Amino acid sequence: ITLLISTFSLLIFAEKNQSTTHIEKIVLGSGCFWGAEKGYEALNGVIDAVSGYADGKGVRANYREITRFTNKFNPNNHAEVVEVTYNKNLISFEDLMIHYLESHDPTQLNRQGNDIGTQYRSIILFSNTSQQEKITQLLTEYQSLLSKEGYGAIQTVVKPLTKFYEAENYHQDYIKKNPNGYCPDHSTGVRFARTNSVKDFDNSILKEGKNIVVIEPEWYCPYCDKFRE
């Protein structure tokens, strides 16, 4: 009996572990997090996008503190970022990063347009070495494209994530709550040469709580069959 219980527990653990290996996170900063969050949530394959703060030291992670005048040019200030949770089976990390780079101006230092200060810095906080390698490759490629169009050097900071702090509730889904809210476009208009496979997708139905969404697994899932009936 003990052996059967142990074997069953191991199978459950293995199935649970396997079912989440395609889910990853990346924390991205590209200026004001309101518009950035909206952009990620529109991508097919993005499970969640949460506005927050990261990469600060000696500064409390809340909006009031990071926007103090004394912290405007503080190199240790937190950056406005978005924690993006995505399904690798539906959107590649490369496509997600292409969207990130094309959606803002990474050549601006500590600002995006009229949003000026270290809180608006361009920053990528990766979760693993695989992400880091792809980021390095894409930044090199994008720099070449930007240079051809007369832009300067990319200022994006790249480092491993230490801690992400979720922003206050009123910042979450801000543009959805305030359709006419502040959402400037600071993108350069420079696009990657290859076709971008990222397409906007209406994920709003997933947040209504009235539908069951079944994502087909790569392995046999006896429970999934029940939902098809």
Model-identified regions with their sequence ranges:
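Short, intrinsically disordered, charge-balanced linker/junction segments flanking boundaries
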Residues: 220-229
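Residues at alpha-helix boundaries and the short loops/turns that link adjacent helices
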Residues: 90, 218-221
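Short active-site neighborhood of thiol/selenol oxidoreductases, capturing the structured segment around
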Residues: 23-28, 207-219
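Bacterial N-terminal signal peptides
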Residues: 1-9
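Flexible coil/turn and secondary-structure edge motifs
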Residues: 15-205, 225-226
